[in-house]
């Protein structure tokens, strides 16, 4: 009888050890998936903002081209050029929708990775086992509630882990696809930004040339610290002021182009990092 | 493609420089057809890059929606599972109480 009890205890301990090990593995996968989901959410938001901004830049380019056409030819911009620019905006709208779909996917992925379903089910199973235990003829003794509770939690974690791995595999391919597409279009993104800045510089230069620009605000960095403001020019802007404004237009434009290029490269890197993080959750990184 | 786009943009800039250098409106008007063509060439080259990826975007969005639905369904199924066990637990409790009354 003593040997039978010792054997039962050994089996129980072995089963408990397996359950704990299983839970630990599942928790690791869930944590990696939760980290990947957080990173994915962040990068999808960056991507949505990026494409929305680029679409707005193209809208601004249309306005600037219209101004340029009026200044140069006293006529509206050519309708076929406008149509091509509108096509560009439609293409960017597709990319905004794609980035938003990535955001929704990240939310669903995060919901599963952070779901407390395993704990809820474990609690519910524990409750059920307690009720079953109160039925007098049911065999098994006091170990049943604990075992049922832990086993059900382990089972749910196992199901979730398998599903997370499978989903992570699919998501990894999706993010890699988006990253490759983004990288292939980087020259077009940077070029669209450059085009907007350059046409803005042209229009600003022409307006400056026609002396219809108040250059006072450009002097603010020098005057503001001393609570001073520029005095409006009585007749026309001086040559020095115009030269100074031209330099400011050139430099600000160049800075804007450089910053956008850096932001584009940084987003490409972030997409790659998100893809790698999802691969970690797959377990084949 | 980067080089081609850069070349088209440079061509556009060169015509715009020429427009800025014009001294009469007539000179500018003469340049207008070339300017419009250069604008079209550049914008079409940009759109061509985007069109090339259109099928990929459609495919990726479809995959994302499918995976999202699958994840949401499983999350819901797991949540429902807990509810079912709780309901069964309540039923057993009631059954046990009924059985004790019947004794």
Model-derived regions: residue spans:
Chain A
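Bacterial N-terminal signal peptides that target proteins for export
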Residues: 2-16
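N-terminal Sec/ER secretory leader and immediately downstream segment
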Residues: 31-143
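Extended amphipathic alpha-helical interaction segments
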Residues: 131-245
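Short, solvent-exposed mixed-charge patches
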Residues: 29-32, 283-285
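Secondary-structure edge/capping motif, primarily at the C-terminal ends of alpha-helices
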Residues: 54, 58-68, 72, 109-116, ...
């Amino acid at each position: 009888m003593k040997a039978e009890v010792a054997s039962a205890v050994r089996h129980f301990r072995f089963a408990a050890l397996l359950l704990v090990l299983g839970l630990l593995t599942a928790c690791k996968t869930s944590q990696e998936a939760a980290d990947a989901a957080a990173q994915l959410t962040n990068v999808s938001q960056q991507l949505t903002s990026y494409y929305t901004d680029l679409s707005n830049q193209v809208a601004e380019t249309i306005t600037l081209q219209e101004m340029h056409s009026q200044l140069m030819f006293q006529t509206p911009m050519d309708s076929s050029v406008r149509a091509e620019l509108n096509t560009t905006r439609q293409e960017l709208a597709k990319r905004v929708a794609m980035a938003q779909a990535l955001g929704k996917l990240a939310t669903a992925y995060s919901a599963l990775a952070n779901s407390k379903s395993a704990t809820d089910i474990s609690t519910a199973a524990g409750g059920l086992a307690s009720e079953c235990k109160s039925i007098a003829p049911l065999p098994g003794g006091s170990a049943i509630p604990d075992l049922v509770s832990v086993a059900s939690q382990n089972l749910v974690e196992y199901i979730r882990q398998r599903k997370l791995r499978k989903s992570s595999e699919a998501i990894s391919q999706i993010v890699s696809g988006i990253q490759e597409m983004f990288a292939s279009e980087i020259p077009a993104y940077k070029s669209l930004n450059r085009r907007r800045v350059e046409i803005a510089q042209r229009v600003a230069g022409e307006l400056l040339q026609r002396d219809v620009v108040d250059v006072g605000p450009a002097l603010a960095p020098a005057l503001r610290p001393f609570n001073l403001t520029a005095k409006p020019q009585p007749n026309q802007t001086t040559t020095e002021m115009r030269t100074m404004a031209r330099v400011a237009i050139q430099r600000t434009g160049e800075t804007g182009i450089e910053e956008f290029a850096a932001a584009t490269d940084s987003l490409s890197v972030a997409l790659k990092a998100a893809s790698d993080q999802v691969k970690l959750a797959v377990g084949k990184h | 493609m980067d080089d081609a786009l850069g070349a088209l943009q440079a061509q556009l800039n060169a015509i715009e420089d020429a427009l800025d250098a014009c001294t009469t409106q007539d000179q500018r008007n003469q340049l207008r057809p070339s300017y419009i063509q250069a604008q079209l060439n550049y914008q079409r080259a940009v759109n061509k890059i985007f069109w090339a990826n259109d099928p990929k975007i459609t495919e990726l969005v479809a995959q994302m929606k499918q995976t999202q639905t699958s994840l949401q369904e499983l999350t819901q199924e797991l949540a429902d599972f807990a509810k079912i066990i709780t309901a069964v637990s309540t039923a057993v409790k009631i059954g046990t109480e009924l059985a004790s009354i019947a004794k």
